[in-house]
């Protein structure tokens, strides 16, 4: 019999500083109306100088631990999904481990861009299946504000900083069981150049004494991203529902990657899921990449939107291309 995996606690953290659309009018050629009508975003959180991805991730982790009624010394593994790590080495996971005051855990980072949290959640499922006593901290955290060209209106209005976290284990908390029932993940590396940060790696290294170019910031082909994101998320959701014998009308909540309201609405429409069943909070946070889904999950949990008996469908799409869906049962 396969060991089941459950989310034991939810946590999130966003930086204190808020940058509104109106604030952005002062330094980029845009307006609140232009941003809102095209993206649905009203504001985003921006990390303070010196505030790092591991800082945000550790705070989200502490909240998830408190929500689960656990101390950090109960953890056995730490998985961190990020494309904006503190450093190339050591891993952000090891830095979070240290900030939680523990050591001796298996700790690693993974990069699947905006799909990172779902990839990490799938890995946590596998760990729990192999080690039923494991308690896995899954963190997704990003400081994208330092990888944005703030003169590029097509990208700088979209992204924000934040972190989300969950604790995964085989024994549900008394009175609350959020089962990670199934997942389906995919990728297509042939399309990687449509959404990327190429600078800083071995293909486009930093060269001493030379100015940092656009290669070190997020670059994307918006129209192509929209088309592929909607098609990929809708298709993977359909496949996951069919595999589990679930009709679309039996989905109680669709919680998609909070990238752009137009994409979210198009995915919901393609799946035939009414808007009142689609969770949206990007108006408050913008696109936080890998952090968007766990941040939204923690938000939904805090609003008591995950009561017993719910079928919840998570889906995401990101650079790579990567995409996927996860089925939760409460």
From Swiss-Prot:
- GO CC aspect terms: cytoplasm
Q: Which GO terms describe its biological process?
A: fatty acid biosynthetic process; secondary metabolite biosynthetic process
Segment ACP-binding: which positions?
A: 258-262
What does the record give as the reaction this protein catalyses? malonyl-[ACP] + acetyl-CoA + H(+) = 3-oxobutanoyl-[ACP] + CO2 + CoA
Keyword Cytoplasm assigned? yes
GO-annotated molecular function: 3-oxoacyl-[acyl-carrier-protein] synthase activity; beta-ketoacyl-acyl-carrier-protein synthase III activity
Which pathway does this chain act in?
Lipid metabolism; fatty acid biosynthesis
Q: What is its EC number?
A: 2.3.1.180
- Quaternary form? Homodimer.
Q: What role does this protein play?
A: Catalyzes the condensation reaction of fatty acid synthesis by the addition to an acyl acceptor of two carbons from malonyl-ACP. Catalyzes the first condensation reaction which initiates fatty acid synthesis and may therefore play a role in governing the total rate of fatty acid production. Possesses both acetoacetyl-ACP synthase and acetyl transacylase activities. Its substrate specificity determines the biosynthesis of branched-chain and/or straight-chain of fatty acids.
Q: What is this protein called?
A: Beta-ketoacyl-[acyl-carrier-protein] synthase III
Q: Which gene encodes it?
A: fabH
